Amino acid sequence: MKRHVASLLAQALKAMREAGELPADLELPEVQVERARDRAHGDYAANTAMVLAKPARQKPRDLAETIRSRLPASEAIAGVEIAGPGFLNFTLTTAARQESVRVALRQGAEYGRSDVGAGHRVHIEFVSANPTGPLHVGHGRGAAFGDALASVLEAAGYHVHREYYVNDAGRQMDILAASLWLRYLEAAGEPVSFPNKGYQGDYIVTHARELFEADGREHVRTAAELGAGLPAEDDDPEGYLDALVARSRELLGETAYRRVLDFALEAILGDIRADLDAFGVHYHRYFSERQLVDQGRIEHALERLDQAGYTYRADGALWFQASVFGDDKDRVLRRDNGLTTYFAADVAYHLDKIERGFDTLVNVWGADHHGYVPRVQAALKALGVDAERLDVRLVQFAILYRGGEKLPMSTRSGEFVTLRELRDEVGKDAARFFYVMRRSEQHMDFDLDLAKSESADNPVYYCQYAHARICSVFRQLEERGLACRVTPDEAALERLDAEHEAILLDLLGRYPEVIESAALAREPHQVAQYLRELAAAFHTYYNAVPFIIDDEALRDARLTLVQATRQVLANGLGLLGVDAPQSM
């Protein structure tokens, strides 16, 4: 309906220009229509007259009067009023409001979907946690946000590709391999010393024992061999770690070292996949950083930057002139030891996405990566790519509270709350809904006690209970032989004249607009907020209006209304990855 109102306004402006009521050379703006904030002022409002007043050299209210006179007739519009400095307020007919009920039931699971995206190809990369440990609650928010955003974009007609970038190359993988091997040696009875900067979690011990069970003592070396020639850890912890990695690689040999590294990677990545699957998050592809190396994609990207004239050599390293494109300084692509940097791999990965034909790249990153955005944008500009094609969404970490107390989290020490633990405690649905209730860039306090409560204060429970309650209504009426006997097209929806019914009708008609708005703004929290509003309206209606009445026509109309409400609740919850239960 919002599009219909915008179309009427566009037709009116065109007619005015043709009639000489607007300058012939005036460029008509894209018509903006919004839901009226106060239902007393109508259903939709447009500020078109105020936007055009200055370029048209007319008073806003006079221009609004002319626009109103030029609006085509519409069976959906009951009236148009001019308010304030020149707002055009549109009021829908009762029939137009009721039509959303019929459309929702006619379209079912498709209700709310549109073609606003016009098949635009969107690549969305999210989570992409290093495969060096289990997913924690911070990753969980990125997973819930990214997956919900992808679903909302799909519902709005975009062609979406979900991808997880696996950082399976570089120093952190060597540290992982060394950490696992040391725990493996412990499992074999060797009294080795574990570095403070190694990966400390129990998951390393678990996977090391699995390696020992699989390969026996094949990779065992003595503690004396390992410690020979290593520097003191206290003097330079990071240098000690690098020396330990080099010593591990030397003692094992390349084949055995690769076996240990691959075992660790596959075990942890397997855990990550399992956690995401259980969280309802699925990808089209897990993209390996190693693939960029093996297929020469990093060298290809560096050659492209060099050909464009934006690289130089200094201090034995290869640099990118990022500062030319607005970054605060130039960035190293290849170190003086010949190894490429993480940034070089990121440039190659983004170029690869572009060369795969995606129109827009959406990156869901932790808020701590905000400083990384300008350098990636700079690289794209240098490669001749419009930086506007990159849309980085920053996600703040969630802070967990239990009993009013903040829970600590530290990945370095191995003491952190994993996504699996959160899911086991509050359930997938509560976790996913809580994660997307607010804008992704806002700090979030996650109250575990609230997420587990069965009360109106728990937003996911409140929304799911609304759906289950409607299902219960139909079960009870079926048992009494009072089930709805008419189709949506036959229902006497004109009987729905109570204020609570008008509110529900208005909300049901808004749903497609909410999906479109959430997609265009890249804000799935809009859907969560809408569902809370719809659930609250239904519960109020349920408590105020009886369904078991003798008036069959009114009863069937009310049942048709709540059935449409159930459908919209199910559709919206589905986009957020939350189940819509039949009973609770």
Curated annotation (Swiss-Prot):
Motif 'HIGH' region, residue range(s) on this chain: 129-139
Keyword ATP-binding: yes
Subcellular location: Cytoplasm
Catalyzed chemical reaction(s): tRNA(Arg) + L-arginine + ATP = L-arginyl-tRNA(Arg) + AMP + diphosphate
EC number per UniProt: 6.1.1.19
Origin: domain of life: Bacteria
Class of the enzyme per the UniProt entry, highest EC level: ligase
InterPro entries xrefs: aa-tRNA-synth_I_CS, Arg-tRNA-ligase, Arg-tRNA-synth_N, Arg-tRNA-synth_N_sf, ArgRS_core, DALR_anticod-bd, Rossmann-like_a/b/a_fold, tRNAsynth_Ia_anticodon-bd
Family: Belongs to the class-I aminoacyl-tRNA synthetase family.
Protein known as: Arginine--tRNA ligase
